[in-house]
Amino acid sequence: MSIKRYSSTADTTITNAYKSSLTTRGTGSNMGAADILEVFSLTGQESSGSVELSRLLIQFPVSGTATGEIKADRTAGTIPASGSVRFYLKLFNAKHGNTLPRDLILNVQAVSQSWAEGGGLDMENYTDIGVANWVSGNLSGSVGAPVSTKGGWDGAWGTSSMDQTTGYTPGGTYHTAAYDPGSDGMPMYTQTFTGGDEDLEVDVTAAVEEWVAGTYLNYGFGVHLTSSQEAYSVGDGTNVPRNLNGSSDSYYTKKFFSRTSDFFFKRPVL
């Protein structure tokens, strides 16, 4: 049995956490060039009812026609046909000196809107402003419009002006419809981290095959705490999502190595 690895082409952390002053949130901050990806839920830091969340976005070369993309490699015979190969998303745990939550459950969902990786670095004070961030996936402007019947903009490749932030939900926009293979929705995956320091390793074959088939555009995955572990909130309509089934406990903090990590063999792979 042979193994082929695909490295991520973009990844970043997005957050609505407060800056060090505890007066403003870092919702406009970008961390696309940081060497760490971070997921957490923090309650009661700014005030008794405050909610702070962090999620990650990650994308792989799946549906393109250039060498090194999964679809192109299948056409070339480099990887087997659908049904004869499995795809696993793997993120490597990054040890740190902060608290580490046990028994946390992370969801892996397909993202439904384009986003930019960005070049921000600051994961402490959130001073690097840019996209993607908690409230915006990308910039408005001239972009290429790919052929797609679902999950994107119709039309042949060309240049057209469109607002890529339209419809963007703070915290990321994900496929949430019930999954009907080849027809509607995208699968969602979960993993439980009993000790907290485990790597993430999830079989995401179904999602990858949907992207290769062109059912939806490949905007990668979002990884975040399951809703019962993200903080309880009635929502504020802007920065904090409504979550009436959430937790009053904090889950702080889970970290993974990003694609810019100096530890080459700890970078995310598919």
What annotation goes with each model-predicted range?
Residues 1-269:
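Secreted, disulfide-rich extracellular signaling modules
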